[in-house]
């Protein structure tokens, strides 16, 4: 009798397995490519495809705001990083708008030397070039640093000058 075969356990308990899958999905959407063992990649692939489909549902214009919010919250159960969620809904979902599946692919690599495990790469099929990804990250960092500097400047200008007379000393 084959029991307990609906879920790939990956030799981990449920909490560890869920954390592993969530982290790998986040990395996949952030870097658009991850490398790991074949067994892990197959599990992550199914979850990632479901999340992309969920994000694509928000592209429909006549969708109720409650449904859009529900879709976003369902995705945020798996992906904790808000920047990655925004990227999924605004960038990745639009790239796959015309496709009805097959958003990811698993490429097999040579077995790992140390333990002879099957290794592969999971990547998005319509992946951006590495140079454009790096440019986007650099631009994003520059924008963030400018915002931080402006915030610091406003804090300095808004801080009231300290009046020595008003600060009371114990008499």
Swiss-Prot record:
A single GO molecular-function term is: structural constituent of ribosome
Q: Fetch the InterPro entries from UniProt.
A: Ribosomal_bL17 (IPR000456), Ribosomal_bL17_CS (IPR047859), Ribosomal_bL17_sf (IPR036373)
**Compositionally biased tracts (Basic and acidic residues):** 140-152
Pfam families reported in the protein's UniProt record: Ribosomal_L17
User: Could you tell me which residues belong to the region Disordered?
Assistant: 140-171
Q: How does it assemble?
A: Part of the 50S ribosomal subunit. Contacts protein L32.
- Protein family membership: Belongs to the bacterial ribosomal protein bL17 family.
Protein name from the UniProt record: Large ribosomal subunit protein bL17
């Amino acid at each position: 009798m084959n029991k307990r075969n609906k879920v790939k356990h990956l030799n981990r308990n449920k909490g560890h397995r869920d954390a592993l899958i969530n982290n790998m999905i986040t990395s996949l959407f952030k870097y658009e490519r991850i490398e790991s063992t074949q067994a892990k990649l197959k599990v992550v692939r199914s979850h990632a495809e479901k999340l992309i489909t969920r994000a694509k549902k928000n592209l429909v214009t006549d969708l109720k705001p409650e449904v859009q919010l529900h879709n976003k919250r369902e995705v945020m159960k798996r992906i904790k990083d808000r920047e990655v969620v925004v990227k999924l809904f605004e960038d990745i979902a639009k790239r796959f708008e015309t496709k009805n599946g097959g958003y990811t692919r698993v490429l097999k690599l040579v077995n790992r030397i140390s333990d002879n495990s099957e290794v592969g790469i999971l990547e998005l099929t319509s992946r951006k070039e590495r140079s454009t990804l790096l440019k986007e990250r650099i631009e994003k960092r520059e924008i963030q640093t400018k915002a931080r500097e402006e915030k610091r400047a406003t804090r300095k200008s808004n801080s009231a000058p300290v009046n020595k007379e008003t600060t009371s000393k114990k008499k």
